[in-house]
Design a protein with these regions (language model features):
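Short recognition helix of helix-turn-helix/winged-helix DNA-binding domains
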Residues: 1-61
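Winged helix-turn-helix DNA-binding recognition segment
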Residues: 43-106
Length: 109
């Protein structure tokens, strides 16, 4: 990876959104990075359901490839995110991929 110094005129490369609330969240780094990746996916390529809520379709195999992790590691991270209230997964059935709703942490007062 080539690097350069940051200056007032240098534009930043593409980056992932990372809510500050995740900094202290009791979950693995993999879960946090996966959340940031899914949030980016929802913001840029999300689909809208009948209620106007944005969801993504992001197969586990693709998540594993994107993060260079095993499918089992991704499944554990997804469980952490679900247990932490940061995602909701809806099964579609009939061999269709799950819908993943990426939930936004509320700001601290």
């Amino acid at each position: 990876m080539n690097t350069v110094y940051m200056t007032n005129t240098r534009t930043l490369p593409p980056s992932l959104p990372f809510p500050e609330a995740l900094m202290d969240a009791p979950m693995s780094i993999t879960a946090k990075v996966l959340y940031a990746r899914m949030l980016d996916e929802a913001m840029n390529r999300g689909r809208t359901d009948d209620a106007g809520k944005i969801f993504i379709v992001f197969p586990i195999r693709e998540m594993a490839f994107t993060l260079s992790r095993s499918s089992m590691t991704i499944k554990r991270a997804l469980r952490e995110l679900k247990d932490g209230g940061l995602i909701r997964r809806d099964r579609q059935g009939a061999g269709k991929p799950n819908r993943i709703y990426v939930l936004i942490p509320e700001e601290r007062p």
